[in-house]
Amino acid sequence: MALEKDEKTAIITDYQIHSSDTGSPQVQVALLTERINGLIEHLKVHPHDHHSRRGLLKLVGRRRRLLAYLASKDKDAYRKLIDSLGLRR
């Protein structure tokens, strides 16, 4: 469920805007999406793990807020991010 350091570094490198960017909305959404996908796989194996399900819902809400912020600030970056991550919005 937690991302390994090399996985996290690879995601940051793929979505960063400049060389020292680690906190832009694009990077945050990409990291959250990876964590969400990991939790979804965990819940397929352990469907009664309600604590993890609550954590998943919190992560989805945080990602939704970040995507709404990005959509209001930069539509082109929003659309590019949605396409690259394969999200349905």
From Swiss-Prot:
Keywords: Ribonucleoprotein, Ribosomal protein, RNA-binding, rRNA-binding. PANTHER family: RIBOSOMAL PROTEIN S15, BACTERIAL AND ORGANELLAR, SMALL RIBOSOMAL SUBUNIT PROTEIN US15M. GO terms for molecular function: rRNA binding; structural constituent of ribosome. Belongs to the universal ribosomal protein uS15 family. This is Small ribosomal subunit protein uS15. It comes from Roseiflexus castenholzii (strain DSM 13941 / HLO8). Part of the 30S ribosomal subunit. Forms a bridge to the 50S subunit in the 70S ribosome, contacting the 23S rRNA. It comes from the Bacteria. PROSITE patterns: RIBOSOMAL_S15. GO terms for biological process: translation. HAMAP family: Ribosomal_uS15_B. The gene is rpsO. The keyword Ribonucleoprotein applies. InterPro entries: Ribosomal_uS15, Ribosomal_uS15_bac-type, uS15_NS1_RNA-bd_sf. One of its GO terms (cellular component) is cytosolic small ribosomal subunit. The lineage of its organism: Bacteria, Bacillati, Chloroflexota, Chloroflexia, Chloroflexales. One of the primary rRNA binding proteins, it binds directly to 16S rRNA where it helps nucleate assembly of the platform of the 30S subunit by binding and bridging several RNA helices of the 16S rRNA. The keyword Nucleus does not apply.
